[in-house]
Amino acid sequence: MARGGPQIIPRPAGWRAGAPNPWHGRLTGEQLSISHIESRLADLKTGRIPALAGPLMRPPVLVTKGQAAVLAALFKGSQGETRVVLTRRSTRLSTHSGEVAFPGGRVDPEEELHVAALREAHEEIGLAPEHVRIIGQLEPLATRVSRAAITPFVGFVDELPPLTPSPREVDRIFDVSLRELIEPDCYREEIWPIPDEVGGEFSVYVFEVEGDTVWGATGRMLHRLLSLLL
């Protein structure tokens, strides 16, 4: 299967190529292991790794619609490699239709963020909460479409059960190895101008995996997770 998928990236006039791949040749197999990922997420939580400063998203987004949470479910593949579960959202959805995303959604009133991420993963891909051990979280971000503060949680699944997509929300469930994500022909950075901000620019992170293109908020989350491992 060829790299890239049906997703359309709405590049603005004036965009340009960004920095080269920051991970290829630098991240080892050990650094891509579950144990190293868990250790680095713990360092982020305790402040040994500085949290990202500045706005939740570039360009800045005014958060007006509460909170959301997503789950990056990691598991070991048949060769011992670390893999992550992704979904292609249904083309029938009103927002981010057809885009690649982690399972997740809005947080209900009085609901804890990680509980919402687990609940949504169960609803969208049939991954029951008892199969997941939360090992950390990334900084929240937001999108101009959702206008919700999205908190990404990282979980480890010891034995991945059969997954079933919710017909209403998910068109495809797939997984990809972290090793593939750092390959030069998979990843690229693009620099986009910020509308109505003279000289303003922001980075867009794109991953061309087999059959799909990951970008936007999910691309930014994957970029952050991989960058933590250096």
Roles of regions detected by a PLM:
Residues 165-208:
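NUDIX/MutT-family hydrolases
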